C-alpha cells in the first residue's frame, strides 16, 4: 500500500476489522448465489424423467412399452397395500351415507374394466377409484401427450411420454392405495379380447375413440353377455345440457356413434348397449374435424401420421370439460348399477316388427318386378336406413313418423340400399302404383320440392357410405 495514508481518525485495528467484514460479506453473498444455482439445477433435473435404467421395448402389437428399474412397481397388477379399515371408511364416508352398507359392500367387492384411458376414460377411472371400486383393470396402448393435459383427469407434466395406464396407476396409489389396479399397456383387438376382458367383470366401460376397435369391444361384450356401457364422441361438442344416456339404437347426431351403430347392425346387434352421447347438432359456426395441411399431403402417405394403422390422423377439437362430463356420467351410471341404487332412466324403444315388415315389402317388390337380388336385405339394414338416414320419418313432406316403411325410389336404377327411401305405408302404396308399376322416373310424379328433399337424403346416405 505504498503511497496510501490511513486517515488519522481511523485506527489500525478498525481498518482491519472493516476489511475482514467486507471479505466475509462478499463470501456470504457469493456462497448464497452458488447455493441457489445448485438448488435450481437440482430442481430442473428432478423435473426430467431419468433415462438411466430405462429402455424401450415393443409389445406384440408394435406398441411402445416403457420398462423402468426393477425396483419400481410400474406395470401389471398393483395388489394394494394394507390400509386401516377405519381410515378407508372415513375416506368413503359420503359414499356410505349415499349407497348404504349393502351398496358399498357391492362396490368394494366389484371388478370393473375400463378400455381407453384418455379424456373420458381417465375421469371414469378416477371416480371409480375414489368411490370404492375394489379392483380396476385399465387398458390402453397410448402414452400421455402434452396436448392431452387439457382434458385428462390425472396426468401431469411429469407423465408426458409415459403410458397412460402407468400415469393413472401411480396417481391412484397416492389417494387410494388399497385398491387393486391391473394396468395393461396394450391395444385391444379380437385376439387380445379373451385375456383383457377375463375375470368375469361386473362392468366393462368402452372409452375408445377408434371405430373398429370400439365395434370389436362392444360386439365381444354383447356376445359374451358382459355388462358394458360405451362413450360416443365428446369432441366438437360444447353444450352440456344435451348429454344423455340411451340405448345405442336411439342415439343421434354423432359421427362416431353413427358409424358404430351401422357396423354393429351389420353384425346383428341393433340394441341392448347403453351409451353416453350428445344430441348437439353439427353447426358450421362451431368446431369441426381439422383438415390436414397441404404440406402433409405433399409428403406422401398421410396414414403414417396416425398412431396405428386405421386410426384417425386428423385432429378432433375438444373442449376440456366435455370428456369429463361424459366420463362422470358413465361413472355415475356404473356405480349406481353395481350398487343397485334405485334409478328410473328414460327408456328408448326400437321397432323390430317395422324393420321386418320393410324387408318383406322389398323382397315382395323384387319378386313382382322380376328382379334377381344380388343380396337379401335384413332387419339391421332397414333399421339403419329408417332410423339413421331418415331419422325415423318419411322422406316425403310432411315427414310423418307413424307406420314408416322402405320402398325402392327409382325403378330405373339398381335395386340396392342407396336407392331406398322411407315412406309411410300409404305413401308407399301410392309410389308403387304410380312410379314402380309404371316404371317411370319419380320426377314425373312428384313436384320439384319433393324431389330435392328425397335427393338430399340419398346424398346423405351415399356420403355416409363413403365416410363410414
Swiss-Prot record:
Q: Name one GO cellular component term.
A: membrane
Q: Which Gene3D superfamilies match?
A: NAD(P)-binding Rossmann-like Domain
UniProtKB keywords: ATP-binding, Ligase, Membrane, Mitochondrion, Mitochondrion outer membrane, Nucleotide-binding, Transmembrane, Transmembrane helix
GO biological process per UniProt: cyclic threonylcarbamoyladenosine biosynthetic process
Q: Which Pfam families match?
A: ThiF
Q: Which InterPro entries match?
A: ThiF/MoeB/HesA, ThiF_NAD_FAD-bd, Ubiquitin-activating_enz
Q: What is its main location?
A: mitochondrion
The places in or outside the cell where this protein is found are: Mitochondrion outer membrane
Q: Known EC number(s)? A: 6.1.-.-
Annotated membrane topology: Multi-pass membrane protein
SUPFAM superfamilies in the record: Activating enzymes of the ubiquitin-like proteins
Enumerate the GO terms in the molecular function aspect: ATP binding; ATP hydrolysis activity; tRNA threonylcarbamoyladenosine dehydratase; ubiquitin-like modifier activating enzyme activity
Transmembrane ranges? 15-35, 109-129, 315-335
Q: Which family does it belong to?
A: Belongs to the HesA/MoeB/ThiF family.
Give the function comment from the record.
Catalyzes the ATP-dependent dehydration of threonylcarbamoyladenosine at position 37 (t(6)A37) to form cyclic t(6)A37 (ct(6)A37) in tRNAs that read codons beginning with adenine.
Q: What is this protein called?
A: tRNA threonylcarbamoyladenosine dehydratase
